Amino acid sequence: MSALDKTMYFDFGQNEKKDVHQTLETVYNSLEEKGYNPINQIVGYLLSGDPAYIPRLNDARNLIRKHERDEIIEELVRAYLDKGEK
């Protein structure tokens, strides 16, 4: 069986999860500091991909753009489901 016939496996590593979590905290705090509703703004960004929903304050816009939106959503879903298990 050649390497092309094998299913690829992607591991969303622990460091990636921590980075996404830290980024979301920074973005959330920056949005609050600017007087915006952080949840609405983050959802707007995740749905549209438009970075204008995120302020430049504290480099939040550049930080969130370092992550793919699907990675952020994956981390949010994982955190939500993990919280429900406890």
Curated annotation (Swiss-Prot):
InterPro entries given in the database record: IreB
Question: Cross-referenced Pfam families, in alphabetical order?
Answer: IreB
Family that this chain belongs to: Belongs to the UPF0297 family.
Protein name stated in the entry:
UPF0297 protein LSL_1110
Q: Which organism is it from?
A: Ligilactobacillus salivarius (strain UCC118) (Lactobacillus salivarius)
Lineage, uppermost ranks = Bacteria, Bacillati, Bacillota, Bacilli, Lactobacillales
